[in-house]
């Protein structure tokens, strides 16, 4: 998920979707924004790992609130092996950085947000996923307060689905 921007009803819808899909881990690609909205993530049935976005101001408070619910805030970038897949997570403010991650050959999956436009593509044998914004999706080039999106990864099949909230 990405770009929740303190919109609590959208965060709740995303959490409901993740719990109903029985996900093992939630990765948030940044722009939670304010620490108060982190409390909603306590309702997740799994752990959440986040990176910071360009609108995440009080990162110390975000980190503290996330740690209180068993989550983590990793800064601008997170890379790890999850389910046997090498995953890179970044907000995606700099498209050149996302492209470098894809071309590096180090990752099976690169996840970014920032653009609010959901997509899934294969590039250089890498699964590239932008879950869009759970709060303010882009529709026909315009930021809206419509139905947001999240993505669900299937690490075994190396595939992803975009789900509307």
Regions found by a protein language model. Give the residues of each.
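N-terminal active-site segment of His-dependent metallophosphoesterases
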Residues: 1-43, 47, 57-59, 68-71, ...
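Active-site neighborhood of phospho(di)ester-bond hydrolases with catalytic His/Asp-centered motifs
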Residues: 1-2, 25-31, 48-54, 88-91, ...
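Active-site environment of divalent metal-dependent phosphoester hydrolases
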Residues: 5-9, 33-36, 55-61, 94-99, ...
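Short acidic, glycine/proline-enriched helix-loop-strand junctions
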Residues: 38-50, 124-128, 132
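Helix-adjacent hinge/juxtasegments
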Residues: 45-95
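Short linear motifs in intrinsically disordered
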Residues: 67-72, 109, 140-143
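Binuclear metal-dependent phosphoesterase catalytic core
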Residues: 79-83, 99-100, 105-106, 122, ...
């Amino acid at each position: 998920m990405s770009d929740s921007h303190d919109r609590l009803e959208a965060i709740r819808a995303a959490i409901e979707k993740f719990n109903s899909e029985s996900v093992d881990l939630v990765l948030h690609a940044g722009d939670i924004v304010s620490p108060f909205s982190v409390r909603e993530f306590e309702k997740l049935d799994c752990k959440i790992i986040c990176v910071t976005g360009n609108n995440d101001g009080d990162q110390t408070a975000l980190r503290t609130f996330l740690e209180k619910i068993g989550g983590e805030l990793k800064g601008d970038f997170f890379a790890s092996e999850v389910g046997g897949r090498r995953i890179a997570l970044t907000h995606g403010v700099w498209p050149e950085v996302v492209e470098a991650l894809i071309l590096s050959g180090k990752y099976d999956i690169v996840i970014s947000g920032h653009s609010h436009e959901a997509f899934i593509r294969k590039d250089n044998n890498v699964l590239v996923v932008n879950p869009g914004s759970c709060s303010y999706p882009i529709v026909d080039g315009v930021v809206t307060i419509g139905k947001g999106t999240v993505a669900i990864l299937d690490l075994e099949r190396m595939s992803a689905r975009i789900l509307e909230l």
